[in-house]
Amino acid sequence: YCIKVYSQNSRGLRATNLEEVLANMKIQGIFAWCLQETWRCGNSIEKHEGGYVCIHHGPKEKLSRRGSLGVSIVLNPTAYSGFKAAGSKCDYYGLRILAITIKLKDTKGKDIFIRLISAYAPHSGCTDEEKEQYETDLSRAINSCEDNDILIVGSDTNASLSCIKETDIQDAGVQRPVGKFGCEHT
C-alpha cells in the first residue's frame, strides 16, 4: 500500500489556493495534504466536489488584521472514507496542531491505522512560553498515536538552516547554527 501525503505552509488559505491544492491532489493522486498558517478561524469540515474534504482548525476569531495560525488537512475520497471508518474524530492540541486517524485495509484485508498530524511551529519572534507550549502540544499529539499506528506529521517547523564558517565566533547565549554543514544563511 502506497500513499502520497504533502505538507505546505499556505500563508493564508484563500479559495484560489484551496482550488489549486484540490486540483493537484486529483492530478497527482495525493491521499492527504497538510496545510499550515491557513489563517482560517474555528473548526470545520468542508466538503468539496468529487468527495474531497478539508478539515480546518484555527482560533475562534482573527488574532491580527491579516490573520494568523490555523492548520488544515485535505483528504481525497479514499482518505475521507478511512477517516469516517476510524470514527471521524478530530483532535486539537492548542491552536497550532490538528490530528486525525484514518483506517484503511492492507492487501490482506488487515486494518491499518494512520495517525495524521498537521502542525505549525512558532517562529523565532514568538515567546519562549509559546514555543514550550507548542512542544508540549506536539508531544501530546505524537503520544496519542497507538503502538501499531503509522504516524505521519506534516509540519511547518519554522526552521532556519545555515552553517557556521571556520571564522565565525558565536556570542554566548545566542542561538546560532550548530555545525559547519548546511547552506549559508541568507
Cite the ranges covered by each PLM segment.
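A shared catalytic/ligand-binding motif for oxyanion handling
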Residues: Y1-T186
